[in-house]
């Protein structure tokens, strides 16, 4: 009589293959690992949501996906974007500035959620958005990739380097 707790390695009859099997001690150790807590990624405060659209070179308007406006890996410039941030369903006021090719810094007030130019084929090079102290964002810039996360009220991207922002990602910290 062979105890199941001592069986290790056997042949599967159904498909005639070798199966390494596990001892009871190994299975108990595995179950113990499953019971341990795991690290969980930070979660946005309840009720904060992002939505918007990006106006992309040769594509037009694209919806935000995974808190990201724009495209990555396609080499296409971000020309304009709209952004709506809600906290528990209430739209949050947004203002800020963008740095636009051949124009420079352009300030925006709380009466708009549209940043940039449409129909002028001008790249956005840097952004500064004021939308509350829990919002962070970063820019994906040509020839650089993703820049560092910045807080609301700080510049993301580059100025005076002639590099286009291709995407902007948002998160709550």
Give the ranges of each region predicted by the language model.
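Lectin-type carbohydrate-recognition ectodomains
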Residues: 39-173
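Basic/polar, cationic surfaces and motifs that engage anionic cell-wall
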Residues: 1-44
């Amino acid at each position: 009589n062979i105890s199941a707790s001592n069986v290790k390695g056997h042949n599967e009859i159904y498909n005639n293959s070798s199966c390494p099997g596990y001892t009871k001690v190994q299975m108990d150790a595995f179950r113990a690992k499953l019971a341990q807590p795991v690290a969980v990624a930070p979660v946005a405060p309840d009720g904060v949501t992002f939505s918007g659209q990006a106006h992309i070179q040769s594509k037009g308007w694209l919806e935000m996906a995974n808190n990201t406006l724009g495209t990555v890996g396609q080499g296409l410039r971000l020309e304009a974007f709209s952004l709506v941030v809600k906290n528990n369903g209430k739209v949050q006021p947004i203002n800020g500035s963008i740095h636009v090719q051949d124009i420079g810094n352009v300030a925006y007030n709380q009466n708009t959620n549209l940043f940039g130019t449409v129909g002028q084929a001008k790249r956005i090079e840097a952004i500064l958005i004021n939308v509350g102290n829990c919002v962070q964002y970063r820019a994906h810039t040509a020839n650089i990739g993703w820049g560092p996360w910045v807080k609301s009220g700080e510049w993301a991207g580059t100025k005076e380097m002639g590099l286009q922002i291709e995407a902007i990602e948002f998160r709550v910290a």
